[in-house]
Amino acid sequence: MALTFQEILDRIRIIDRDVTELNRLKSRLPADRPYSSSLQISFDKQINELLNERVGLMELEVLDPPSWILGVPTTGISQETPVPLKGLFPSGDLSKEKPDDQDVINFLRELPKTEIHLHLEACVNKDTMKRLMAKNGINVTDEEFEAKFNFKDLNSFIQVFFFIQSLVKEPSDFSFFIESLAEYMRANNILYTEVFFAPSKFIQNGLDFEEMIDFLVNRIREEKENDGIVIRLLVDVSRSFGPENAMKNLDRVLKLRHPEVIGIGLGGAELMGPARDYQGVFQKAREAGLRVVAHSGEDDGPWAIWEAVELLKAERIGHGTSAIQDPELVKYLRENHIPIEICVTSNVFTGKYVRKEQNHPVRYYYDQGLPLSINTDDPEIFNVNLTYEYYKLWRFLDFSLDEIVDLIRQGVFASFHPNKESLWAEMEKNIHLVKTRYGLKR
């Protein structure tokens, strides 16, 4: 879709104004009022929706690029020839003492990134869900549909996943999932991602595991061939269905021969399934050469993380929010180079240990030298994206832009990418170019 330059510019101005005002109101919320957490969530949803819309607008092409715009010549360009909008704007100056928020967001978006804690179902946007519902004859009113996403805690949040999974009726439906994931990666300049795929509910609904994986892998290969983005799968053996089901899922994985499937994860309702119940599953996976990660410390205390690292030998910890309660655990994670997959917005939304970004332990973890990666967890459910996750670190948790670049580097080396050094070397070259455009020292 191509619009006129003025139409797009007017809408972007309104979005920037509204985002600035919402951030101002959010910063003034008192911390000790019963309504504060719900208002913060409301502000976050509005801000994230606006920023996602802005990203979409910048991807559009304009029909009438004016010759005077920022000194960019348009001689020879037909008024009927669409031109990418983002190419018409200069980069902001981030060397200023107080750079503009929107310039920071634009800078962060342009930086190449990786993301390694991401659920496939939660990458499907609502419009795509509705297309899938229409395809499969699923009738849900708009009110019923929106009510599905009004979760109050982690358990009710998991029900959202079950709803999304229920929309899939045949393996080819996963084309909608990979299409949305690839669009999300491109919009945030994510070059490599490790995404969780939870098969249990799909299998209960009558789908065949190998057929699902075959279709997912074929679509993943198509996206890589299209523009080079790399997607790898971690099969979530899941707490939600018990240890016996988890072992069955592992056995299914072990029969595969796809290099795109690199390991397993343990997700689901943390309080329903302590890590010790899955020790045998993880031992068998490790012995088979699979990579192993576990959600832990999201809805339970630091003892749960101890079990994940000591009994499961998890190579990374998803969320790890409660680790801050145990200094010995923080020391152990640092000394054993076990990364924490940080998901700031997700932790605020589920609200067990964190109600405001300012209170998230990521700043403490970074200062303590823990290896970290920054992630969204569930971008379409939380209306967030990876660019804005990094922006929150700058805006609310006092991370400098250089520290954010360091976090991007840490994310690469926390991944299971087979050639981390070469991936980072290529990313670093591009980061230097972006920093130069924005007036920052290399």
From Swiss-Prot:
Record EC number: 3.5.4.46
InterPro entries for the chain: A/AMP_deam_AS, A_deaminase_dom, Ado/ade_deaminase, Metal_Hydrolase
Keyword Membrane: no
Catalysis: reaction(s): 3',5'-cyclic AMP + H2O + H(+) = 3',5'-cyclic IMP + NH4(+)
Domain of life, source organism: Bacteria
Cofactor(s) it depends on: Zn(2+)
GO molecular function: cAMP deaminase activity; metal ion binding
Any single GO BP term: purine ribonucleoside monophosphate biosynthetic process
Keywords, alphabetical: Hydrolase, Metal-binding, Zinc
The UniProt record lists the keyword Transcription regulation: no
Protein family membership: Belongs to the metallo-dependent hydrolases superfamily. Adenosine and AMP deaminases family.
Role played: Deaminates cAMP into cIMP, thereby repressing cAMP dependent metabolism or genes.
PANTHER family: ADENINE DEAMINASE
Protein's UniProt name: Cyclic adenylate deaminase
Organism (species): Leptospira interrogans serogroup Icterohaemorrhagiae serovar copenhageni (strain Fiocruz L1-130)
